[in-house]
Each structure stands twice: as structure tokens, then as C-alpha cells.
Amino acid sequence: MATVPAAEYATASVLAERGGTPVEVALAVAGPFEGSAQHVVQVNRRAEAPTASRVTVLRDGLLDDSIRGERWEVLLERTSAGSWAISEVKRAWRCRRGAQPDRFSTVRCP
């Protein structure tokens, strides 16, 4: 997966600092959804008082001629103040055309 520069998710970072949940933050990173299916999976480190969270956003059937789907991985860490901070964001694409249309790639679709 390709690492996304922090400048591209600055608005979501502010949401995290202001008390947004990990899922809210991940959806803010991924942006508006226009497609047929979206799946969100959240995995926390420690169940009752999570210290870290990984949120995966899978999107398929996008309304785009070249991009069939997207996969976002958003890693968050709990701060000493109790809010969340984004520690890393990665992204991959699934293309409609090409040699492997059923696999995610770190290269944007043509």
C-alpha cells in the first residue's frame, strides 16, 4: 500500500484531535463515498480502553471509469489527552482494466 502524505488528511487530523472516533476519522480521510459497497473494519489494541486502532475502509463499485475500488488503512494512537492522533495512512487501488483487476495495487489506475 502507498503511504499518504499527512498534508492530504489534515482535516481528518483536526477531527481526531477534537474527539472524533477512529471510524469517523477514517471516513474523513477516505472522503465522500460514491459506489455500490463500502465496508469498514476497526481493530483496537485493548478492548475496553483502546490505546491504538486500525481502521480499514474498503470501497467497491466506484463510479469511475478506471478505478473499481479503494482500500484505506488508517492507524491511530490514543494521545495522553485522551483524543486520537493519526499515525499513518495507506491507500491502494483496484483498477477496472489491467493485468490484475481483482487485486489492489499501490499504483493509481490509468
Language-model regions: role of each:
Residues P5, T11, A37-H39, T51-S53, ...:
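Generic structural motif recognizing short loop/turn segments at the entrances and edges of beta-strands
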Residues Y9, V14, H39-V43, A92-C95:
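Generic preference for hydrophobic/aromatic residues in regular secondary structure cores
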Residues A16-L75:
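Mature extracytoplasmic domains of secretory-pathway proteins
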Residues V74-R103:
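Short beta-strand edge/turn micro-motifs at domain boundaries
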